[in-house]
């Protein structure tokens, strides 16, 4: 748990920064009184998952501080891409100023995101992204570097005869792909 606390705090700070940036982007005049409407669609809402609980809490705190309206729409499982896309479609129909989105797939949401952009809805990717660069802003960890650092550390603990299994969370999500890439780079010729 200790190793995750730093990551969770960092993500919460990044979420607050994202809302601050959005407040500035969406505010055409310094005297604007209209509240910014935001919808956040994380990969999952699960009170037993410290990471997503912290991300959602950080978004809520930042929205409150900057007097923005925030609605959270989340699927029941991280790998439930179909449900996440249904929620994205619902969010687009509500026409918020911005959609904050943590895609569970690198390519299955692109058409919906294009539709949102066509309707003038700003898009912020949080934690992961899609293949097409449809976002106005991305708030994420450098997952290749994080994986590389872990691979370099693991390399110190193993020898050439060691066998390593890489087990990922959700297949095809950008965070998993990048972390594995970095881990393999960090292992070097041990990979």
What are these regions (language model features)?
Residues 49-60, 81, 85, 110, ...:
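Short, surface-exposed alpha-helical segments at coil->helix boundaries
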Residues 150-190:
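An alpha-beta-alpha
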Residues 25-55, 65, 72, 136-137, ...:
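Short beta-strand segments enriched in small/hydrophobic residues
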Residues 89-92, 98-117, 183:
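Hydrophobic alpha-helical
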Residues 106-145, 163:
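Flexible loop/hinge segments that line or gate small-molecule binding clefts
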Residues 71-93:
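Structural motif
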Residues 92-103, 122-126, 165-166:
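Periplasmic-binding protein-like
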Residues 9-24:
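Hydrophobic membrane-insertion alpha-helices, especially the h-region
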């Amino acid at each position: 748990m200790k190793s995750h606390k730093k990551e969770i705090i960092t993500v919460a700070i990044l979420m607050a920064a994202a809302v601050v940036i959005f407040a500035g982007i969406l505010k055409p005049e310094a005297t604007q009184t209209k509240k910014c409407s935001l919808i956040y669609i994380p990969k999952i809402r699960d009170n037993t998952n410290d990471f997503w609980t912290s991300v959602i809490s950080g978004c809520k705190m930042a929205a409150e501080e900057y007097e923005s309206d925030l609605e959270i729409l989340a699927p029941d499982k991280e790998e439930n891409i179909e449900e996440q896309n249904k929620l994205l479609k619902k969010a687009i129909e509500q026409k918020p100023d911005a959609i904050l989105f943590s895609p569970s797939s690198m390519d299955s949401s692109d058409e919906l995101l294009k539709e949102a952009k066509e309707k003038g809805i700003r898009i912020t990717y949080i934690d992961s992204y899609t293949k097409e660069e449809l976002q106005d802003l991305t708030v994420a960890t450098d997952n290749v570097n994080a994986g590389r650092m872990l691979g370099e550390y693991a390399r110190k603990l193993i020898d050439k005869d060691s066998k390593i299994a890489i087990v990922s969370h959700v297949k095809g999500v950008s965070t998993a792909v990048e972390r594995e890439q970095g881990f393999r780079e960090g292992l070097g010729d041990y990979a």
